[in-house]
Amino acid sequence: MKKLVFVPVFLLALLVRQAHAQMYVKAIRANDTVPIKGAIPVKYEGKVEECYEYKDAAGLHLFLATSTSAGKYFLGTCYTLVNGNYVQDWQIKDYSSLEVAMADDYTKIVDIDGDGIYETIIIYEYPTEGNKYGGTTWKLLLHYKNQKYAIRAHQKDSDYDEEDLTMDKTFDTLPKSLKKYVMQYWNKLAKDQNAMEMFDLKK
């Protein structure tokens, strides 16, 4: 008969605190207006928009956002260090015939639910195509437990146009704390852009 091993609550709490104490996020490039701090340890093409090194309970990671062809192609890629080499975990791709630009200083690498694993939030924009009135398309992408969740909005430039806001139905499957955090963060963007009528997500 196997013996049960009981871990004291205080020891378990200590181990959790130690794991969280080892977590960090370091900006190699916070946005495209500041210099790159140090070498980027993966191959890439185009311009580095943002780059972060971060460590959590799953290991050491790198998030790299790049744009190519005058900003028309956008890639957001996450890597994890495995046996001394960075291996791609996931990637976000987007394209505009004009330009795709990240919203400066809005990238979030944060442990929202406190499980020791970082979630990633990125926000970017590009000119709305196929709309005779123009305008801007905004996207927020959350990466959580190997799945992507998106909020999309069309910001109008003309009084003859209509604004539009859509949220992936999969957001309803998120834990309430995560969904609330992301909605509040999106609303912060709305406030910063003076576009509350379009962006304001109801709690």
Residue ranges: model-predicted function:
Residues 4-15:
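Sec-dependent N-terminal signal peptides
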Residues 16, 21-48, 136-138, 143-203:
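Acidic, small-residue rich beta-repeat scaffolds with periodic aromatic anchors
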Residues 30-90:
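N-terminal "first-domain core" detector
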Residues 58-65, 113-124:
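Acidic/hydrophobic-patterned starts of short beta strands in beta-sheet-rich repeat architectures
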Residues 63-71, 97-99, 128-135, 140:
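Short consensus segments that form the blades of beta-propeller domains
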Residues 73-74, 105, 121, 134-138:
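Short, surface-exposed coil-to-beta transition loops
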Residues 75-114:
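Short N-terminal edge-element motif at the start of the domain
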Residues 108-118, 143-149:
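A short, structured loop/turn motif at beta-sheet edges
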